[in-house]
């Protein structure tokens, strides 16, 4: 996801395809060019700081201080400088975050989604001391991945069979609507006519 997201930020394409589904000239190599731009910067955070990566998931993670763990696979291109290529070290890094999770959205990476699901606690304790299932959503275009996650013991997972791009677009739309509604309700007109926040 990170490479495709960064390619979209830098070149406006994903695997060389534009948002309207058209192939771009030399598009088959754009993901490698994106990786190389980040490698030249030194890290994803530095690529954001230098204005190379200007929007997208990874940009938002860096700007808002959201931790992320990128682990490799045997067929990785690149990889990006932030990718942990040692499988055991990658699992350890993932475990440090999954134990603190209050919600998980697993998107379009079968092996990583299943591995993460296996590390997640089934239940979490809220601030008020109540116990609840950990909200877990698995998004993939393959029903196999969604089913496999539940079959491997992540019983609390809710599966969404769709492509990741559509899911992310819809998720963003609803999050933005929710934020707009909260902003609107936070602005109240005081009896004197003054606006308070």
Tell where the protein language model's regions lie, with residue ranges.
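C-terminal functional extensions of proteins
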Residues: 2-3, 17-104, 109-197
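Extended, H/D-rich, highly charged conserved domains that either
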Residues: 5-7
């Amino acid at each position: 996801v990170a490479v495709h997201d960064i390619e979209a930020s830098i070149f406006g394409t994903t695997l060389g395809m534009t948002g309207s589904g058209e192939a771009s000239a030399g598009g088959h190599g754009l993901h490698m060019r994106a990786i190389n731009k980040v490698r030249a910067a030194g890290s994803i955070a530095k690529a954001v700081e230098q204005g190379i990566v200007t929007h997208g998931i990874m940009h938002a993670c860096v700007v808002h201080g959201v931790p992320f763990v990128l682990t490799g696979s045997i067929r990785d291109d690149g990889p990006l400088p932030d990718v942990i290529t040692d499988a055991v070290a990658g699992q350890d890094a993932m475990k440090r975050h999954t134990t603190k999770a209050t919600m998980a959205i697993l998107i379009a990476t079968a092996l990583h989604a299943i591995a993460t699901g296996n590390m997640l606690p089934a239940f979490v304790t809220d601030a008020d001391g109540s116990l609840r299932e950990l909200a877990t959503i698995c998004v993939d275009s393959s029903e196999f991945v969604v089913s496999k996650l539940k079959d491997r013991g992540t019983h609390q997972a809710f599966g969404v069979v769709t492509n990741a791009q559509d899911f992310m677009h819809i998720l963003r739309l609803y999050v933005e609507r929710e934020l707009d509604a909260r902003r609107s309700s936070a602005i109240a007109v005081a009896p004197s006519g003054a606006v308070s926040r």
